[in-house]
């Protein structure tokens, strides 16, 4: 079967891989000379812990596929795990409730509550001032998104003969056919549209009335940390407990959310929660904020970065905070589920809306999709 894919972000690559592994003849079209969207602008966190319980097996499948892809394609991956640091009693309480809730589940073997000194022995990146303890999880991985996503096409071509057409915009897609900007027609049996936050070019009518919108995030990266300093696991803190759905069932979360809303309403307004990951070059990637829909402006205002840094300093210690880069990314966020997957014409499927989970879930979701979709 001939499969055409629009977009060489992580979603498009995931579909290309899953389709090619099933023996299909795959062609990927990407309008930019190299992937430059959300997939290369993120933390590189394979954030299994942030996923709701019903997504754990898909997230773990994704994680395994990342490790496999890294070996095959030759990019860096670290099974670094993660720590949620607690600097307030309510944060510690939420973490304790989360562990208690998962005591009888498969997740239990991956989780451990650490006291203050155990936490400090796991990372020298935790700010010891007011540190109460942390939640350790061993399931998270780290990749450098830019090098990982940009190295996968060569590997997929080498290993599975996937064809990539970069600098090639798809201007029209319909059953059996893709038309590109140079007027060429390409014939396919199945087409998967992984065009990220571009809701305007292909099937714009499909997005009308659907709870999907763009979300803009501010990000920063430090210079290489001195003397080979390593952060160890990914670090997150109390603000993150409000962000991912996994902590929703914890009874103390509402009180924590209320405290933060009262103490610092701008954090809710700007969707700020803070996290840090460290790439293979020793640089620490820092973020982030969330502005949705009509709030998305092309201008990056420095006050957002200042708020992010102020919160990071409260929970994280770094040998140097000197910044090497600032940027923003935009992803498509679908709020009625973790991905927007819709057949828009016979044999043509739109697959986007992964929000802040695309790096974590794309490989697993694409596998799941191809096992459901087959045979045509
Ligand atoms: C700042 C930031 C931090 C994040 N951190 C994490 C994280 O740590 N962990 C995690 O799991 N997720 C994270 N995410 C989310 C994750 O990055 C996204 O969910 C994911 O990258 C979306 O992938 P995508 O392939 O759908 O979109 P994209 O990466 O945007 O790719 C879409 C591609 O389609 C191409 N395209 C669009 N239209 C056409 C067309 N007509 N013809 C040809 N090509 C076209 C675009 O050029 C683009 O390359 C983060 C996102 C951001 C922005």
Describe each model-derived feature in a short phrase.
Residues 185-252:
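Central helical "cap/lid" subdomain
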Residues 2-27:
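N-terminal Rossmann-like FAD-binding beta1-loop-alpha1 element of flavoenzymes
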Residues 271, 279-285, 291-376:
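C-terminal catalytic lobe of FAD-dependent flavoproteins
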Residues 136-175, 186, 190:
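Helical element adjacent to the flavin cofactor pocket in flavoenzyme catalytic cores
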Residues 43-122, 131:
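Dinucleotide-binding Rossmann-like beta1-alpha1 core, especially the glycine-rich loop
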Residues 21-40:
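Glycine-rich FAD pyrophosphate-binding loop
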Residues 57-58, 85-94, 135-154, 299-304, ...:
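Short beta-strand to alpha-helix junction loop
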Residues 213-216, 223, 237-313:
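Conserved FAD/dinucleotide-binding core of flavoprotein oxidoreductases
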């Amino acid at each position: 079967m001939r499969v055409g894919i629009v977009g060489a972000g992580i979603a498009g690559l995931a579909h290309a891989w899953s389709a090619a592994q099933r023996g299909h003849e795959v062609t990927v079209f990407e309008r930019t000379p190299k992937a430059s969207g959300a997939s290369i602008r993120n933390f590189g966190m394979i954030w299994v812990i942030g996923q709701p319980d019903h997504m754990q097996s898909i997230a773990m499948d994704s994680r395994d596929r990342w490790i496999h892809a890294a070996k095959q394609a030759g990019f860096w991956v670290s099974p670094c795990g993660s720590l949620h640091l607690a600097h307030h009693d309510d944060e510690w309480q939420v973490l304790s409730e989360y562990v208690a809730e998962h005591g009888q589940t498969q997740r239990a073997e991956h989780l451990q509550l650490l006291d203050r000194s155990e936490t400090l022995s796991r990372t020298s990146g935790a700010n010891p001032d007011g540190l109460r303890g942390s939640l350790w999880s061993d399931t998270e991985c780290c990749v450098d998104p830019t090098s990982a996503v940009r190295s996968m096409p060569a590997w997929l071509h080498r290993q599975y003969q996937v064809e990539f057409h970069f600098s090639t915009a798809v201007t029209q897609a319909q059953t059996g056919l893709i038309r590109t900007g140079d007027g060429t027609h390409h014939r396919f049996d199945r087409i998967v549209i992984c065009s990220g936050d571009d809701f305007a070019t292909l099937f714009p009518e499909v997005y009308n009335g659907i709870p999907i919108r763009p979300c803009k995030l501010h990000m920063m990266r430090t210079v290489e940390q001195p003397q080979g300093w390593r952060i160890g696991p990914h670090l997150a803190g109390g603000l993150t407990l409000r962000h991912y759905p996994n902590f929703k069932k914890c009874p103390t979360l509402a009180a924590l959310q209320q405290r933060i809303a009262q103490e610092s309403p701008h954090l809710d307004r700007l969707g700020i929660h803070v996290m840090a990951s460290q790439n293979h070059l020793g640089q620490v990637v820092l973020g982030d904020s969330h502005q949705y829909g009509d709030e998305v402006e092309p201008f990056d205002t420095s006050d957002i970065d200042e708020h992010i840094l102020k919160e990071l300093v409260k929970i994280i210690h770094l040998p140097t905070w000197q910044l090497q880069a600032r940027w923003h990314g935009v992803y498509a966020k679908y709020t009625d589920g973790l991905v927007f997957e819709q057949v828009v014409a016979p044999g043509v499927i739109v697959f986007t809306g992964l929000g802040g989970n695309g790096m974590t879930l794309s490989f697993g979701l694409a596998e799941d999709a191809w096992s459901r979709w087959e045979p045509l």
